[in-house]
């Protein structure tokens, strides 16, 4: 009897593992629990305001009154038929040129400091430090620098230039001066992106090229730039978007007056100074569409390289 009971106990099927089912379900749910809060915040603070902005662009809302009337495409017609509203995009050309100069300078410094250079850590900090500063602080520093008789004029006197130049008052120099400030402030971001990308290029490629007698400019042009092309493409997208959405530096330094008014400054003034929130919303929608369109064109012209699957 004892041997029979032992054999029957051994041949009995093991009990079903019901306890393993809940952990397996939790493994499927856990990633969504981690994503829930960021997704809720993203929808609440990004997509809902965008949808509200688009809906406001079809109304004549003044931003204060609870009443708003549907006006259809009238706000968009005003933007494209009133030259004083849409022509301010021309100011962005100065910042667009400055963004390409900024990318070129950042790429140059990243390439130089990626090789064996003395005091590399010091120069990296000097280049990246302006990006850490608050935009308002940067604007006030350069406001003092550019004022008549300010620091820049005093430096020019040391080299023999005795005339006081209206850096912000001269329409021919104001946007050049302001775009130069943006180059100084944002070059550090592109510099860090390029430096990290260059350092990720395999060192074997550098060594093989140097053994073949390639110079550093040749290594830069034929090895480094093709290897970091996705990062360069990202910097171009960020530069174009930044050039079209410039606000704080010209607004603080000149108040966005005259030829220094940008599209974003005009949009803010329409909403909060002239109480034309509907028209300002339409302007913001147009700016969003322009940036998305330029990004799409850029991605089509410079497609992302895909590594072949093995």
Give residue spans per PLM region.
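Alpha-helical transmembrane segments of integral membrane proteins
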Residues: 14-27, 309-310
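A structural signal for multi-pass alpha-helical bundles of membrane permease subunits
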Residues: 27-310
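Short, intrinsically disordered terminal tails adjacent to the first/last structured region
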Residues: 1-19
């Amino acid at each position: 009897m004892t041997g029979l009971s032992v054999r029957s106990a051994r041949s009995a099927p093991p009990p079903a593992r019901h306890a393993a089912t809940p952990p397996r379900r939790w493994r499927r749910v856990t990633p969504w629990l981690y994503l829930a809060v960021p997704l809720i915040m993203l929808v609440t603070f990004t997509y809902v305001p965008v949808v509200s902005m688009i809906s406001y662009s079809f109304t004549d809302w003044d931003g204060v009154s609870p009443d708003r009337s549907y006006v259809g495409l009238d706000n968009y017609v005003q933007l494209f038929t009133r030259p004083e509203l849409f022509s301010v995009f021309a100011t962005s050309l100065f910042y667009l040129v400055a963004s390409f100069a900024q990318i070129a300078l950042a790429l140059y410094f990243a390439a130089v400091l990626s090789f064996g250079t003395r005091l590399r850590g010091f120069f990296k900090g000097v280049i990246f430090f302006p990006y850490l500063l608050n935009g308002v602080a940067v604007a006030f520093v350069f406001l003092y620098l550019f004022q008549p008789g300010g620091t820049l004029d005093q430096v020019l006197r040391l080299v023999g230039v005795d005339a006081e130049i209206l850096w912000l008052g001269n329409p021919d120099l104001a946007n050049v001066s302001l775009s130069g400030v943006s180059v100084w402030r944002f070059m550090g971001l592109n510099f860090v992106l390029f430096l990290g990308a260059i350092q990720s290029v395999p060192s074997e490629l550098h060594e093989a090229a140097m053994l073949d007698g390639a110079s550093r400019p040749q290594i830069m042009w034929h090895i480094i730039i093709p290897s970091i092309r996705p990062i360069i493409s990202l910097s171009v997208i960020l530069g174009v978007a930044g050039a079209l959405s410039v606000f704080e530096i010209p607004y603080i330094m000149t108040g966005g007056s005259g030829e220094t008014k940008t599209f974003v400054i005009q949009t803010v003034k329409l909403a909060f100074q002239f109480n034309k929130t509907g028209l300002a919303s339409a302007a913001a929608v147009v700016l969003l569409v322009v940036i998305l369109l330029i990004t799409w064109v850029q991605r089509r012209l410079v497609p992302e390289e895909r590594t072949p699957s093995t």
